[in-house]
Amino acid sequence: MKKVFLLSTLLCTIILTSCVDSHDNPVVGPDVPEVKDYVERLVPVVDPRGEAQGTVMLRFYNDMPSVAYVSVGNFQSIMYPGTTVTAVKTAPDQYMLTSPCGTATVDTAKDLFESDDYEAFTNLMGQVQAGMPNTTYDALPIIRWKSLEKMPENVHVELDYGKYGIDLRADDNDVYFPFATIADLYVDGFMHLADYNGQTVMVAPNGAYSLGDGYPQDFIEPILQETRTADMADFAYKNLCFTLTNFFGYPGRTLLENNGLREKGLDQALQDYGKGGQMTRELLKSENMYDYIAGTATLGCLLNDGGHTYTDVTVISQIDKETPFYTAMNQVKTAKIDEFKTYCPEYADVAKVIYDRSALGKELKEKRTEKMGEGVKYYKEGSTAYCWFNSFLCDDSGWRKFYKGEGPKPTVETFPDDWLVALIDALEKAENDPEVKNFVLDISTNGGGSSDVVMFITSLFCNKADFLYENTLTGQRMKCSYDVDRNLDGKFDEKDDEVEYHLNFALLISSYSFSCGNLLPALLKDYGIPLLGQQSGGGSCCVLYNPSADGFGYRYSTHRGRLINTKGENIDPGITPTYELGTDDFFNVEKVMQLVESYYQNK
């Protein structure tokens, strides 16, 4: 009994003592480490040549371990070194983002991005020319940006990532986007872009000039596995749906556009497009890499716009054709495309347009050769001169060296394959020949190139250098004006105003004339230059290389630049000639001369 009493007393003392200690002498336990729901990985950043461009910290959240996230600030820093984006938390789940050129807000509860000028917020073009806004420019040294008019000036943009199941995240210091998602938001008309292949981030500081051969084989190689993880397959499909619904340029001719792509979104449009669309949807969602790649190819059939959009990731992603992966993948892709065609017989009409254009181009080249000779770029008959101009591309490296003072000015002797050189040579010959009155620029077999060259030509022919386009996301119409080095002496000065040609200009076009070969006739016709031939082939959108979530690249017509004429009309249907010609008359110089001289006499 005594022992029990003593034990009871002891227990009471312990209990009372414990109560007293909890107030007067608290016991401090060991620190409990913060439990993070992600891991971070510092990964190398390279350019397309594999040269080091630094490192960047990526996050991988536990619920999506295969999908890389990046802070907005870190992403800005690799895209525009020396700059960043600051994030300020303004309320629970609400953040204000400030970049060097603009602002935006993010709601991480609703997964919502908003901005009154999202192009300013993502503007990287200051790296190309100081003070330049986010507009289309290939940065050939023969022209330079002058001004940009936007109508209206600002439009509020709301991008609802949550609608597509894309999760935006944050901590106290920054906002985090899936890497591919923010890369899609930033890619611009110069093709500044970034992609992540699971090991390395690739950036393109020189835009399209560093991606002339597409995505490098070394960058693509780590992606070439037979399967994809479930979280990557799910996210990649959601991200593709968001991008092609919101950022597609909607030229107006694709099968999915005609099936309500813009109104329904990509996912629903595929579900509603019969067996062909449903098959494509399942392939794109597949964890089998071969099936997925096949799905990007069949999607390309549904978005075929004549030559700008290629969602088939094998088009610009270099894959070694001697590898077992390529052999197996190509067998699956070929079989799936054949199956798709049985579900989508209307695709035959789309493919026929491409085939007919190619056949016409071959026919016209043969007729030109028969009349003027093989490879002849300048041909004169009586008072009329023809200049064969087969591409809106030039040897940009040669011209860049000249403008930097590192090399001689390109000439027909040193750069015989440069179409810009050929044009200038032809103009000088015609201008200095007293017999020549009419100058016909033949772009009847020209499939496109750089809009910078288009601006150069409109400046010489019409003293105008205005690039007209609309943003299909915001509805804004743009007029981007350029200074042009009209005498190509390497300087932008008053001597450029002295350049003048006393010639009756005309343009020869056909359905093969596509993209820039469609833009030039659209502008020249509005400026009063006669067009001869057949209706041009269309192609109204600027083209972007875009990263897929897996790390592949694809290309598509972008919302950032759907080309318009001076009336504000989409030019994708093609441009009707002033005088229609049968193919037998394209190089009937006598008939062409009569039409051109009649036009100018009655003008």
What are these regions (language model features)?
Residues 8-9, 15-35:
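Bacterial Sec-dependent N-terminal signal peptides
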Residues 101-105, 119-439, 445-447, 452, ...:
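Flexible, low-complexity junctional segments that flank or bridge functional domains
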Residues 67-82, 175-188:
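Amphipathic, non-transmembrane alpha-helical segments in extracytoplasmic/periplasmic proteins
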Residues 25-56, 222-225:
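N-terminal low-complexity, Pro/Thr/Ser-rich intrinsically disordered segments
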Residues 207-227, 234-237, 241, 393, ...:
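C-terminal "post-core" interaction segments
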